[in-house]
Amino acid sequence: MSAKGSLLRLLWQCGMTRAAPESCRYLYTSSWRADCNRASLTRVHRQTYARLYPILLVKQDGSTIHIRYPEPRRILTMPVDLDSLSPEERRARFRKREGQLKEKKEEPELADDFDVEQYKQFWTKK
């Protein structure tokens, strides 16, 4: 089967080079060299990725992936979708967040009775 597939690919490339105009004959048409599997097995060759740091991404289901991220962290967790949780888990998470959601009491502002004229003598030149 693989010999048949490679023969068909060769015939297709030969047919494409004859049918294509002269300027398009030198285009890279083979897909077996630069597919996604090869790209994932090699290192990053570009200098534009020099400032990306390797971190561990934790998904909602608990699975982990090593990715590159612009900020230096060790672990990055994805937020949990509250709609997918059971009602008991949702209530437990809400109870945890209740302390953070409470409004802080605002302190009354102090009355400002500063008089500029009283201290003006200290910064004027004589």
From Swiss-Prot:
Task: Give GO terms for biological process.
Answer: translation
Q: Which Gene Ontology terms cover its molecular function?
A: structural constituent of ribosome
Q: Where in the cell is it found?
A: Mitochondrion
Query: Which keywords label this protein?
Result: Mitochondrion, Phosphoprotein, Ribonucleoprotein, Ribosomal protein, Transit peptide
User: Does the keyword Transport belong to this entry?
Assistant: no
Give the UniProt entry's GO cellular component terms. mitochondrial inner membrane; mitochondrial large ribosomal subunit
Presequence positions on this chain: 1-34
From what superkingdom does this record's organism come?
Eukaryota
- In the UniProt record, does the keyword Mitochondrion occur? yes
- Major localization class: mitochondrion
Which residue positions does Phosphoserine occur at? 86
Recorded hits in PANTHER family, A to Z, give: 39S RIBOSOMAL PROTEIN L55, MITOCHONDRIAL (PTHR34095), LARGE RIBOSOMAL SUBUNIT PROTEIN ML55 (PTHR34095:SF1)
Record note on quaternary structure: Component of the mitochondrial ribosome large subunit (39S) which comprises a 16S rRNA and about 50 distinct proteins.
Question: What family, per the record?
Answer: Belongs to the mitochondrion-specific ribosomal protein mL55 family.
Question: What protein name is recorded for this chain?
Answer: Large ribosomal subunit protein mL55
- What is the native source organism of this protein? Bos taurus
Q: Gene behind this chain?
A: MRPL55
